C-alpha cells in the first residue's frame, strides 16, 4: 500500500508541475513595457486638456473619456 501512495504522490506532483502554465513573457507580467506601448488619453492628439475629455469623433480611435 505504501508503494501505491508513493506512486500516487509522485504522479500528483508531476501533474501539478505540468499543469501550471509558465507565462512569464505575458504583457501582464511586464507593466512597464505595456505602458510604453499604450497611448494614454492625455497624450492623445485629439485630447482636449481644457475640458479634460475627448471630442466625440476621437472616441472610436481610443481617446477616453469622451465629452458627451
From Swiss-Prot:
Signal peptide: 1-19
Positions of modified residues (4-hydroxyproline): 55, 65
Tissue specificity annotation: Expressed by the venom duct.
Residues cleaved off as propeptide: 20-51
GO CC, alphabetical: extracellular region
Gene Ontology terms for molecular function: ion channel inhibitor activity; toxin activity
Keywords, comma-separated and alphabetical: Amidation, Disulfide bond, Hydroxylation, Neurotoxin, Secreted, Signal, Toxin
Protein's cellular compartments: Secreted
Major localisation: secreted
Disulfide bridges in this chain: 53-67, 54-63, 59-66
Modification type Cysteine amide: residues: 67
Purpose of the protein: Intracranially injection into mice does not elicit symptoms.
Family: Belongs to the conotoxin M superfamily.
Record text about domains: The cysteine framework is III (CC-C-C-CC).
Name listed for the protein in its UniProt record: Conotoxin mr3g
